[in-house]
Amino acid sequence: METATLVAISISCLLVSFTGYALYTAFGQPSEQLRDPFEDHED
């Protein structure tokens, strides 16, 4: 394969894996450790 194709595929895989990790952190099991700033402040 050409170099440009390999670079494009690797950047795409990196972006997809980063997005998957961000979604897992936001909505998966680690999200229980995140604090909610709206619940921290009482009006």
UniProtKB/Swiss-Prot annotation:
Alphabetically list the UniProt keywords: Chloroplast, Membrane, Plastid, Thylakoid, Transmembrane, Transmembrane helix
- Return the GO cellular component terms, semicolon-separated: chloroplast thylakoid membrane
Transmembrane spans: 5-27
Origin organism lineage:
Eukaryota, Viridiplantae, Streptophyta, Embryophyta, Tracheophyta
Per the record, the gene is psbN
Predominant subcellular localization, coarse grouping? plastid
In Swiss-Prot or TrEMBL terms, this protein is called Protein PsbN
- Spell out the family assignment given in the record's similarity comment: Belongs to the PsbN family.
**PANTHER family, per this entry?**
PROTEIN PSBN
